[in-house]
Amino acid sequence: MTIQYTFSMIKPDAIKRNKIGQVNTYLENAGLKIVAQKMKFLTKYEAECFYDEHRARPFFNSLVEYITSGAVVLQVLKGEDAIILNRTIMGATNPAEAEAGTIRKDLGESIEANSIHGSDSENSAKREIEFFFNKSEIIE
């Protein structure tokens, strides 16, 4: 097992329903340590840059509109095999298909409003963490 860092974003639907603490509890109970966390409103430009890999997909504009519709909580998580552990506790993208006990099954509302985003690879984690955080913001 390897100690890794990964990126997580609590999405506007969960923020609006006051679920930040509940999401953090899922993450911490899974063995992940929150080493950086901040709340902000993403600008359209930030959202477009962050989701640039999806720019050609038909859902891109609605994704940008959704993610800028309210505040998000940006996080850096640390733990053994943190990327896969975070992906596991998040659950499938579609809450209807996610396993019971996962964040998306228990808190998600739809494929888009599924409460949480998490890095899917080491490269994505590095890029996403560096997109939002300076090294000085990550507290071990």
Curated annotation (Swiss-Prot):
Compartment annotation: Cytoplasm
GO molecular function: ATP binding; metal ion binding; nucleoside diphosphate kinase activity
Gene3D superfamilies, A to Z: Nucleoside diphosphate kinase-like domain
Keywords recorded for this protein, A-Z: ATP-binding, Cytoplasm, Kinase, Magnesium, Metal-binding, Nucleotide metabolism, Nucleotide-binding, Phosphoprotein, Transferase
Identification of the protein by name: Nucleoside diphosphate kinase
Keyword Cell membrane set for record: no
GO terms under cellular component: cytoplasm
Protein family (similarity comment): Belongs to the NDK family.
NCBIfam families per record: PRK00668.1
Binding annotation for ATP: K11, F59, R87, T93, R104, N114
Xref: PANTHER family: NUCLEOSIDE DIPHOSPHATE KINASE, NUCLEOSIDE DIPHOSPHATE KINASE DDB_G0292928-RELATED
Enzyme class: transferase
Superkingdom of origin organism: Bacteria
InterPro entries membership: NDK-like_dom (IPR034907), NDK-like_dom_sf (IPR036850), Nucleoside_diP_kinase (IPR001564), Nucleoside_diP_kinase_AS (IPR023005)
The organism of origin for this protein: Rickettsia felis (strain ATCC VR-1525 / URRWXCal2)
Catalysis performed (reactions): a 2'-deoxyribonucleoside 5'-diphosphate + ATP = a 2'-deoxyribonucleoside 5'-triphosphate + ADP; a ribonucleoside 5'-diphosphate + ATP = a ribonucleoside 5'-triphosphate + ADP
Subunit-structure text: Homotetramer.
Cofactor or coenzyme needed: Mg(2+)
One of the protein's GO biological processes: CTP biosynthetic process
Gene from which this protein is expressed: ndk
Species lineage: Bacteria, Pseudomonadati, Pseudomonadota, Alphaproteobacteria, Rickettsiales
Keyword Transmembrane helix appears in the UniProt entry: no
